[in-house]
Amino acid sequence: MSRVKRGVTARAKHNKVLKKAKGYYGARRKSFRIARQAVIKSGQYAYRDRRQRKRQFRALWIQRINAGARQHGLSYSRFINGLQQAGVDLDRKVLADLAVNDKAAFGALAEKAREALAA
């Protein structure tokens, strides 16, 4: 049986991990064993936070819509309910953008929601 020398593959594996750990502080950047743990943990954080980002943006959009709706005398829930009754089919991302960047259009939507609630 011939001897297997793993110097090249081991070095390549180490370099791959150390490259991912570039920019980390101290031994997390230099030591393979510690860097490997840091890279694995960073992957876990990234996986978790890709899902949390969707929740956080939706919460931000709702806060912005609520603030815009209250400037027009409506709560968030009544504003959304009024839009649904009026048949306005805009998602929260678009509504939040209108509340921040186009206050006139958002005001028109608020008026439409108020009319639908009154009817």
From Swiss-Prot:
<dbReference type="GO" id="GO:0019843">
    <property type="term" value="F:rRNA binding"/>
</dbReference>
<dbReference type="InterPro" id="IPR035566">
    <property type="entry name" value="Ribosomal_protein_bL20_C"/>
</dbReference>
<keyword id="KW-0687">Ribonucleoprotein</keyword>
<dbReference type="GO" id="GO:0005840">
    <property type="term" value="C:ribosome"/>
</dbReference>
<dbReference type="GO" id="GO:0006412">
    <property type="term" value="P:translation"/>
</dbReference>
<keyword id="KW-0694">RNA-binding</keyword>
<comment type="function">
    <text>Binds directly to 23S ribosomal RNA and is necessary for the in vitro assembly process of the 50S ribosomal subunit. It is not involved in the protein synthesizing functions of that subunit.</text>
</comment>
<dbReference type="InterPro" id="IPR049946">
    <property type="entry name" value="RIBOSOMAL_L20_CS"/>
</dbReference>
<protein>
    <recommendedName>
        <fullName>Large ribosomal subunit protein bL20</fullName>
    </recommendedName>
</protein>
<keyword id="KW-0699">rRNA-binding</keyword>
<dbReference type="InterPro" id="IPR005813">
    <property type="entry name" value="Ribosomal_bL20"/>
</dbReference>
<dbReference type="GO" id="GO:0003735">
    <property type="term" value="F:structural constituent of ribosome"/>
</dbReference>
<keyword id="KW-0689">Ribosomal protein</keyword>
<comment type="similarity">
    <text>Belongs to the bacterial ribosomal protein bL20 family.</text>
</comment>
<dbReference type="GO" id="GO:1990904">
    <property type="term" value="C:ribonucleoprotein complex"/>
</dbReference>
<dbReference type="Pfam" id="PF00453">
    <property type="entry name" value="Ribosomal_L20"/>
</dbReference>
<dbReference type="GO" id="GO:0000027">
    <property type="term" value="P:ribosomal large subunit assembly"/>
</dbReference>
